Amino acid sequence: MKTRNIFVLMAEAFLFTMTACSNSTIDIDNTPDINAMPNPLPAKGEARLFTTTADGVKTLSETTAEVKSGTNMAPTTLQIDPSKQYQSIDGFGFAITYSTCYNLLKMTPEARKDFLTRTYSPQNGYGASYARISIGCNDFSSTEYSLCDEQGLEHFALQKDETEYVIPILKEILEINPDLKIIAAPWTCPKWMKVSDINTHEPYDSWTDGHLNPDYYDTYAQYFVKFVQAMKEQGINIYAVSPQNEPLNKGNCASLYMPWQEEAEFVKALAAQFKKNSLTTQIYVYDHNYDYSNIADQDDYPIKIYNALGDNFEGSELVVGAAYHDYGGSNTELDDINAQAPDKSLIFSETSIGTWNNGRDLSERLMSDMSNVVLGTVNRQCKAVLVWNLMLDKNMGPNLDGGCQTCYGAVDIDPNGYSRLSYNSHYYVITHMSSVVKPGAVRIGTKRVPDNKNLTHSEFINPDGTYATVIMNTGDSDVSLTVDDGTNHFSCDVPANGVVSCRWNK
């Protein structure tokens, strides 16, 4: 059954393995090269290309092109310039929520392994390399909770969502990709740390809204330390944290209002505790929308934190940058923040598709998400891009009352048997980047570009010396061009309303 906007995998398609893939049965038209695991590493003299079109005719379709040496006389040329270097790349990935893990664990072990290998393996898959998790609950948890609901840090403990769902899945992913980076953020502090007003310190007994009691800044920082240490004991390294998910959001099923004035003070305590406990976990401030919820005195939230803290505080080197979401405002805000703090990093840490943006319609979403979520952020200095849930069921769950009831996963699974998968735009845009742009890559410039306003692109040099480019074409006509690295070149066709990711050896 062919569809325009998503492709569907039946359970049988996942029963193949890398050594016995010929036993699989699948409708090839609906899937991305399902009879063999993707192989992003090009041979010498070869370019490897992945192509997706908004009409769904091509979905991560894998081809190769001959890399030729000598003079390139092609009139339509994209020539890279490795001498122009911008930010390094940490990776691309998805949020691993309780709901994602619940659905993954409903799959057969064989099907789950094949799906995770296809998604995360650097050698035999698309090489997704970053994950986002919550510290305590989020709006796709089994219930509202913190890791220390009873007052006193002696009661700190990982809970069922972590021990039975998130940690087992993370361990499976880490077996496939040991270099996976993980960023973690709380949706709320424990309720006993909350007050309704930081001046009166009036207790605030609610999962939603409230402020962190200033008397508990140091205690809450120790809570973060305990979390990082507890995950380390499970063999899981927390690469980075943000102090608060969506600090200007007073809603959701769990939240904590933390304007920049309060986050700055907490970050100072957090960095000091990390330093005291010999943790190298990085800290990304803010973690919310481009428009700062239209609160006037919260504009340029990260810059105000940097200016308030300065550089002379314990653990200052751990405060590396800021994280952004796109539920309000424009990604041009990244240009402004980078101009004011060029020594600080930027990452894009959350976006979702759902009923509000026709999230299951590839013809509606592919070009927009490719432009705004990945290329529009990476070309504005973001060194990582993460989208929200990797997997939800087709009923948009499991989820919590008060949280998002209208979100889709990057992948949707049919809860009737947990064997039928539907892939949405967020899966494609992340894997179009991760398949060719590897952790540690550096974004580079161009010397010559085609005179075509419908093309948007980004170029990289990987740690292994291979080059990569990702090109999107929003026009209604195919574009044939030559990609040139100054020594070698190859031909590349970018289909109308399509994306091509290329990686090649010098």
Describe each region flagged by the PLM:
Residues M18-A43:
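Bacterial Sec-dependent N-terminal signal peptides
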Residues A95, S134, Q244, H325, ...:
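Conserved residues at the C-terminal ends of beta-strands
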Residues M37-T76, I182-A184, A221-Y239, P247, ...:
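Substrate-binding and catalytic surfaces of secreted/luminal carbohydrate-active proteins
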Residues M10-T19:
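Bacterial N-terminal signal peptides
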Residues N23-I28, D81-G93, F140-S146, N395-A410:
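Short, compositionally biased low-complexity segments
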Residues T25, C137-D139, P190-K191, P247, ...:
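Feature marks short, surface-exposed loop/turn motifs that line or immediately flank catalytic pockets
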Residues L60-I238, A264, K268:
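N-terminal catalytic cores of secreted or lumenal carbohydrate-active enzymes
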